[in-house]
């Protein structure tokens, strides 16, 4: 360890953190964590399977929901290897190249999820504001084009991350703050000038903030449209179609905002709190989104139950 921490030796291996102070209980902590990953993967896989196999769900809203499920699957699978290696096998080491690759996929799928939530907010606005032209505007081809464009946009946005991190020198510390690699966490360990990473990281965070602002704008327009509907029953019916999406937005953005505030203003907070919040960031959205959409979306719920009943028969 003395060689690794020497300032004259460039670091090529990082050490991730499990639960600080609870290392003795990692094997027991792995049980709920592995269960959450399993439920998230099965839940999002089920959403994708139901939408693919049910022709009646081949509509814009459900295509966008399948995009959300794919981004959730990507988030889960990106962090899964290091989390399992720490809690199951007590192996916190990760090579620098593997770390840079992991942070690319984690940030890429996070940006993609933010983009999908933005698309879904405009989808809900269009469905409520102009229902007669909804299907003619959002055709299958146009939905596919939107999905491809936003996927490329998400990956291109984070593509510089691993290359800028790779150009930095790491020669003092090699202990990261989480169970997986994040851009802002890795760049803090650099002993060379990391201003480019700081600026580009801020730009990436700004893009997420723009998505959030546009989602808020779309819901302001939705609320304005709903208030213009004469019937209270129709107002509630229109708003009810947005509940699942609003829950998904809160579940995704709230942990990001909390973690950003902690990193920026509460630097002396307990490392355990830091790790817990970071794990919530990647575990909770993929875990809860399928549950929320199955519970609140009748079309999904009915078909999931029907598939389960068929298997029992």
UniProtKB/Swiss-Prot annotation:
Membrane-related topology note: Multi-pass membrane protein
GO cellular component terms listed in the entry, alphabetical order: plasma membrane
Q: Which residues lie on this side of the membrane: Extracellular?
A: 1-27, 78-101, 163-198, 260-274
Show the GO MF annotations.
G protein-coupled receptor activity; olfactory receptor activity
Listed as disulfide-bonded, the cysteine pairs are 99-191
Report TM segments.
Answer: 28-48, 57-77, 102-122, 142-162, 199-218, 239-259, 275-295
> Keyword annotations for this protein?
Cell membrane, Disulfide bond, G-protein coupled receptor, Glycoprotein, Membrane, Olfaction, Receptor, Sensory transduction, Transducer, Transmembrane, Transmembrane helix
> Which regions face the Cytoplasmic side of the membrane?
49-56, 123-141, 219-238, 296-313
Where would you find this protein in the cell? Cell membrane
Q: Which SUPFAM superfamilies match?
A: Family A G protein-coupled receptor-like
Pfam families, alphabetically? 7tm_4
Glyco sites are at 5
Family note:
Belongs to the G-protein coupled receptor 1 family.
The protein's matches in PANTHER family, at most eight in alphabetical order, are given as: OLFACTORY RECEPTOR 51A2-RELATED, OLFACTORY RECEPTOR 56B1-RELATED
Protein's job: Odorant receptor.
Record protein name field: Olfactory receptor 51A4
Which organism does this record belong to? Homo sapiens
């Amino acid at each position: 360890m003395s060689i690794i921490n020497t300032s004259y030796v460039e670091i090529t291996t990082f050490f991730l953190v499990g639960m600080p102070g609870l290392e003795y209980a990692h094997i027991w902590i792995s049980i709920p964590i592995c269960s959450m990953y399993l439920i998230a993967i099965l839940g999002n896989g089920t959403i994708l399977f139901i939408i693919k196999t049910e022709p009646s769900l081949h509509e814009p809203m459900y295509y966008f929901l399948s995009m959300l499920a794919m981004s959730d699957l990507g988030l889960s699978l990106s962090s899964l290897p290091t989390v399992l290696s720490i809690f199951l096998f007590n192996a916190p080491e990760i090579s620098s190249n593997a770390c840079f690759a992991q942070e690319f996929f984690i940030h890429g799928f996070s940006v993609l999820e933010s983009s999908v939530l933005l698309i879904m907010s405009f989808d809900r606005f269009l469905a409520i504001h102009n229902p007669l032209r909804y299907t003619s505007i959002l055709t299958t081809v146009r939905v596919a084009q939107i999905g491809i464009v936003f996927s490329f946009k998400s990956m291109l946005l984070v593509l510089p991350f691993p290359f800028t991190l790779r150009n930095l020198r790491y020669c003092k510390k090699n202990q990261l703050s989480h169970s997986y690699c994040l851009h802002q966490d890795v760049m803090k360990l650099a002993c060379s000038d990391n201003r480019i990473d700081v600026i580009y990281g801020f730009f990436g965070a700004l893009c997420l903030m723009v998505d959030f602002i546009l989602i808020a704008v779309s819901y302001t327009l939705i609320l304005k449209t709903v208030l213009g509907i004469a019937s209270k029953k129709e107002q509630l019916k229109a708003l009810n179609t947005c509940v699942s999406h609003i829950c998904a937005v809160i579940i995704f953005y709230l942990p990001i905002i909390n973690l950003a505030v902690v990193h920026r203003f509460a630097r002396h907070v307990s490392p355990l709190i830091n790790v817990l919040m970071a794990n919530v960031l990647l575990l909770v959205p993929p875990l809860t989104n399928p549950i929320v959409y199955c519970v609140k979306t009748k079309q999904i719920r009915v078909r999931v139950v029907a598939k389960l009943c068929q298997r029992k028969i």
